[in-house]
Regions:
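Nucleotide-state-sensitive switch-loop elements of NTP-binding domains
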Residues: 1-12, 16-192
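Short, solvent-exposed amphipathic alpha-helical segments in soluble enzyme
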Residues: 50-51, 146, 223-228, 341-342
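C-terminal lobe/tail of nucleotide-utilizing enzymes
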Residues: 166, 192-333, 344-346, 350-362, ...
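Generic beta-strand structural signal
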Residues: 315-317, 340-341, 371-376
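Short, surface-exposed loop/turn motifs with a glycine/proline- and acidic-biased composition
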Residues: 362-379
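Short C-terminal beta-strand
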Residues: 382-384
Length: 395
């Protein structure tokens, strides 16, 4: 079973490549599904057919779906939202403002990931391809499982007795009933399951789609850094709209410029396959055209092949304590940051942040120092820990 998420800068052809990969896998005898989590939902246009919330077979072995996030949101969050509205109403807040405040940030997007999880766990498919939104939205989407779990933990404590102790001090605040707690606990569990699936070694990976242009390649490098920071593995790069050699002077200039960028891709993503799609005379619309496009892209390669697992994060024992190592390809000393917050390590690259919950041994240590080893695609953050004498003997 494989899950492959496709993302890249807007307009590079993510939807076409995701659908073509699915069509190619189906042509090779796999049961394959392509799911759109992009609010623009151009997948139906690429396939030339109407799609709904449930997977439908569009050709032999190939299935497709477009997630109705609004309906999924109402099923999963309505009970909690009703309770929050009652709390805010008891506090005298205007109903319109209260309704705005009870919208869980990013809920609709992450519920699209729950649909992906359900399809992957169903046992019906050998491959699930996910047509994601452009890069910035996809990165936000992939951060959401961890972010929302943090948000929910603070919205309603995990233990009912804690919530009851707090809320009963204020008589005007309604006490949440079992339905509310069950909804929150269910969503917390589902978020953890989504995160586990999408970071599962050998099962899930991200495939970057780009065009051989300097600005697009630069964004792809930043995307690799962000995905590595949050624990997601990239399994390859698809370069779309590559000009074939030959032609007039105008095309030869384009070929020269693109070849320079393709070499930059090889240097920026060493060890990863680089598949290329030639600039076609028209859009591949329909399953037949997409399957042909996919065959041209992947050739004899398996579009759903196994991904060698390269651990992004590791902890090793040292002479003086421990060393935590995190792959951060293309990060620099200028944009990498590090801080400690209780049991969490806050790692940043530029404006991006991730809270890494430390394992038990490291929670009883102090951070002695950190450095960024290597450069370019080989950059890694190494954090040194030493046992805290006041805590280390406790167990």
């Amino acid at each position: 079973m494989r899950v492959v998420l496709f993302t890249g800068k807007g307009g590079v052809g993510k939807t076409t490549v995701a659908a073509a990969t699915t069509a190619r896998a189906a042509a090779l005898g796999r049961k394959a599904l392509v799911v759109s989590t992009d609010p623009a939902h151009s997948l139906a246009d690429a396939l030339g057919t109407e799609l709904g919330d449930e997977p439908v077979e569009v050709d032999g072995g190939m299935h497709a779906a477009q997630v109705d996030t609004q309906r999924a949101f109402e099923r999963s969050w309505r009970a909690v939202q009703r309770y929050l509205l009652a709390v805010l109403d008891a506090g005298g807040l205007d109903p319109v403002d209260a309704a705005e405040l009870t919208v869980l940030p990013g809920a609709e997007e992450v519920l699209a990931l729950l649909a992906v999880r359900d399809a992957a766990r169903s046992g019906r498919f050998d491959l699930v391809c996910v047509d994601c939104a452009p890069t910035a939205e996809t990165l936000r989407l992939l951060r959401l499982p961890e972010l929302l779990r943090w948000w929910l933990d603070r919205l309603l404590p995990a233990e009912r007795r804690v919530a009851r102790a707090l809320l009963t001090r204020v008589r005007s605040v309604p006490m949440p009933d079992a339905t509310v707690f069950e909804a929150v606990q269910r969503l917390q569990g589902e978020l953890a399951d989504v995160r586990a699936l999408l970071t599962e070694p050998g099962t899930s990976s991200v495939r970057l789609v780009l065009t051989p242009e300097a600005v697009v390649v630069a964004e792809a490098r930043r995307t690799l850094t962000a995905l590595s920071l949050h624990g997601y593995q990239v399994d390859g790069v698809v370069a779309n709209r590559v000009f074939p050699a030959g032609g007039d002077a105008w095309r030869r200039r384009w070929v020269t410029a693109q070849q320079a960028q393709l070499e930059a891709v090889r240097q920026s993503f060493p060890g990863l396959p680089l598949w290329q799609a030639a600039y076609a005379g028209g859009e591949p619309v329909g399953v037949g055209a997409l399957a042909e496009f996919g065959a041209d892209v992947y050739g004899s390669a398996d579009p759903a092949g196994e991904v060698p697992h390269v651990p992004a994060l590791s902890v090793q024992r040292t002479v003086d304590g421990f060393a935590l190592s995190l792959a951060l390809p293309h990060a620099t000393h200028r944009d990498a940051t590090l801080s400690r917050s209780g049991d969490d390590l806050v790692v940043g690259v530029g404006a991006d942040r991730r809270l890494l919950t430390l394992p038990s041994a490291l929670r009883r240590c102090v951070v002695e120092g950190a450095r960024l080893d290597g450069a370019g695609p080989d950059a890694r953050l190494v954090v040194r820990f030493a046992p805290d004498p006041d805590l280390w003997m406790r167990s």
